[in-house]
Amino acid sequence: MRKEKILFIFSVSFVFLAFFLLNTYTPRTMDDFHYAFKYTDSGRSSERISSILDILTSQFHHYFISNGRTLVHSFVQFFSFQKNDILFNILNSMAIIILITLISVYLKMKTGYNKFAKLWLFSFLFFWFLVPSPSLTLMWKAGSVNYLWTSVLIMGFLCLHHNVSTSGFAERWWAPFLIITGILCGWGHEGLSVGVALGLILYHIYNYKKISISIIYLVIGFLIGTSIVILSPGILRRADGLMLTTDIFSFVVKRLMAFYRMFFEAQTKATMIIVIVMIVQFFRNRFILKEFISKNSLLFFCFISFLIFQLLTAFPGHARGAMGLELTAILLLLSYLINIRSEISIKAQKIIMPLLIFILLIDYSSALSSCIKNSASVKMLVSNYIDSNNGIVRSPFPKKFLNDRFLWYRYSSDSSYPQNVAFSNFYEHEKPLIVLNAGLYDQLYSGGDLFKKYNLIDLKSGFYTSPELDCYVAKQSFKDNSQKKNVKINCGFDSFFQVIKNKHIVSLMDRVSRHYSKKTEAKPLNTEKGSYLLIFKYDLPKRISAREIIFID
């Protein structure tokens, strides 16, 4: 028992300190800038948040304009006007501790595993390695409050739901508490609340004979909270056209692409693992699989609901949209491993935990080192931008970080890129932020070989590029080039595929690539050295490069 307490205290202390340091070296980004300003009836204003009253009026308008996440975004706006980030860093680190503790409590109640310290550490290790896009779900203010803190509410609700289901709370005077608690837990982020709400409905329809009046109060509260979020005028306006389309082909293609992103681009590692585990168990021993699903039926219904929800909404491009799906997958995976622990040899059990801790320490060290470098780069970016006359700065970021899982540092040479716009507004610079990568900046300002014949992509349009650039560049003969131009890009496979020696495969790939084209915009860039048009390579799929660029009238 003493060893268990020591292990638990040490684990909690280490995790708190580890995340406090990561948060300390995580600068503002994206929506952290946006939510520093008030919302009015006409949208986001240029007036900064300065008081609690400002937050209340701002969130009232935000509900009708943007989305219904009033509770979480109230916290985001509260942290946005603090003079420093110490309070947020402490609370966000505590949120990690609370979430892992609630996961462990829930698993203990469901499985009966009573070695809580080991369960807590094991839960954290799985969470660390499997949580989707930690840079967007655990670190920055808006992201962590929307996803991490909402996950705390969801796990707290699941623990309370299990406790009420098994122990009663039959007294009528508990009703207000259960309803209000349900509302608060459901009134978070629709990406997490909707899947749980659908799972609860399916679960209680399936187990309608076991439902109690206390559970009805709790579930009704959660459904009310979820409804407040998803029925807000702001979120309905944003979702307009997301679910419906007059083109059946487009509808099907978007959902197929959503399925692809879900399993291959959105870092849904836990989902892939638990799906594979259940498929293997189906062929190995269907009785064990049936028993596992029966014991975890609520989680299973939530998991299926999240899958359906993600596919119907064509799945968000960022992995953070999979937070609810991955959270339930992690719970199912941990529950499964606890149930089959007797089948794992004692020797293997003794090896697995130290091995995971060793990998964690290496991963954390590289992540913290990268966060420190990123923080220094952002400070340099702010300083250079404030001192600049035209808003154009050389990117201070390394070409590649050692470990970028906990980083979000995407600034662009496109002044209309959301990160750039938010940054410019926050620092009140009259010129929009334009971050040129080191290669492009040096080519344009220090002279180089960019505009040589061997870098020419298309003679008619006059676009050039080189491997280290993130865009295609064309000179303009006139000053003050402020007009975007529509272009059509005819594409081909890039040099990556030159390693293929089979002439038939190369010929086939070449013919296929010639049929791929994309319409996009060439955006203006005015510097004291000249005027240019830029086409960003991130507009094209990976391993695809421009073969011909045509201006469209």
Locations of the language-model features?
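Intrinsically disordered, polar/acidic, low-complexity terminal segments
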Residues: 5-66, 70, 80-99, 103, ...
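Membrane-interface transmembrane helices that cradle and orient dolichyl/undecaprenyl
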Residues: 154-174, 210
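Alpha-helical transmembrane segments
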Residues: 5-19, 118-125, 179-180, 218-223, ...
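Transmembrane alpha-helices and membrane-interface helical segments
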Residues: 98-105, 156-163, 199-207, 274-284, ...
